[in-house]
From Swiss-Prot:
Keywords assigned: Cell inner membrane, Cell membrane, Membrane, Protein transport, Translocation, Transmembrane, Transmembrane helix, Transport
Source species: Campylobacter jejuni subsp. jejuni serotype O:2 (strain ATCC 700819 / NCTC 11168)
Gene: tatC
GO MF terms, alphabetically ordered: proton motive force dependent protein transmembrane transporter activity
Family, per entry: Belongs to the TatC family.
Stated name of the protein: Sec-independent protein translocase protein TatC
Quaternary assembly: The Tat system comprises two distinct complexes: a TatABC complex, containing multiple copies of TatA, TatB and TatC subunits, and a separate TatA complex, containing only TatA subunits. Substrates initially bind to the TatABC complex, which probably triggers association of the separate TatA complex to form the active translocon.
Compartment list: Cell inner membrane
Keyword Lipid biosynthesis included in the entry's annotation: no
GO cellular component: TAT protein transport complex
Spans traversing the lipid bilayer: 17-37, 73-93, 107-127, 159-179, 191-207, 210-230
């Protein structure tokens, strides 16, 4: 059994090595440009709360260095995503038919675009609104906000990556439909459960306020509907199966 899996494990190791190597190279580049990247990350806070943004602090000796490394890794991961998606496709492509292999460019492009769309939606809409709501709530309670660069970067990267990955839902649905794991009737049948899972996922991945949760859950429900339409084109349920339901 191991001998049968050996070629696949070797191929998996190769694809992982290329992906990690790309991230390492991009990390070095991004670390050299960390000041510019950090300015981009702070822009949403500056846009809505400029006075608060002037007083972002460092309270631990190692915090500045660790934050610079986190920012660099975050940017390196984002820039490496097209390569990571490409390597994933190259790993699964040998098990596909020739006509399915021609989907490699659309798959990588679609996956990259959807992640970028989710990250941009979070950057331009969710992060500014969430920060304004949360910090103003504290100010209204007579609390003095003391924001450290480490906590800001942790918050920012968590929600941006969460939105980017969440927006991959149509891509994942397309892939599962293409290999025959799901059809449109499956998604329609589990719609209510999916909405519940979306709201639970949003509650875990967003700040603890209702606004941020709905800003994630709303688009995801829409993307679930888009996934149904995509799967309906890629792997529609048989007519007799639909009539039974």
């Amino acid at each position: 059994m191991f001998e049968e899996l050996r070629p696949h494990l070797i191929e998996l190791r190769k694809r992982l090595f290329i992906s990690v190597a790309c991230i390492v190279v991009m990390f070095i580049v991004c670390f050299a440009l960390r000041s510019y990247i950090l300015d981009i990350l702070k822009a949403p806070l500056i846009a809505v709360l400029p006075e608060v943004a002037k007083h972002v602090n460092v309270i631990e000796v190692q915090e500045a260095l660790f934050t610079a490394m986190k920012v660099s890794f975050f940017a390196a991961f984002i820039f490496s995503l097209p390569v990571i998606f490409w390597q994933f496709w190259k790993f699964v492509a040998p098990g596909l038919y020739d006509n399915e292999k021609r989907l490699v460019v659309p798959f990588v492009s679609f996956a990259s675009i959807m992640f970028a769309f989710g990250a941009c939606f979070c950057y331009f809409v969710v992060v500014p609104l969430a920060f304004k709501f949360l910090i103003n709530f504290g100010l209204n309670e007579d609390f003095n906000p003391v924001i450290t660069i480490g906590t800001y970067v942790d918050f920012f990267t968590k929600v941006v990556v969460a939105f980017g990955l969440a927006f991959e839902m149509p891509v994942i649905a397309f892939f599962f439909a293409k290999i025959g794991l799901i059809d449109d009737s499956f998604l329609k049948r589990h719609f209510r459960i999916a909405v519940l899972v979306i709201f639970v996922f949003s509650a875990f991945m967003t700040p603890p306020d209702v606004l941020s949760q709905f800003l994630m859950a709303g688009p995801l429900c829409g993307l679930y509907g888009l996934s149904i339409l995509i799967v309906q084109k890629v792997n529609p349920a048989p007519k007799d199966k639909e009539s039974d339901e």
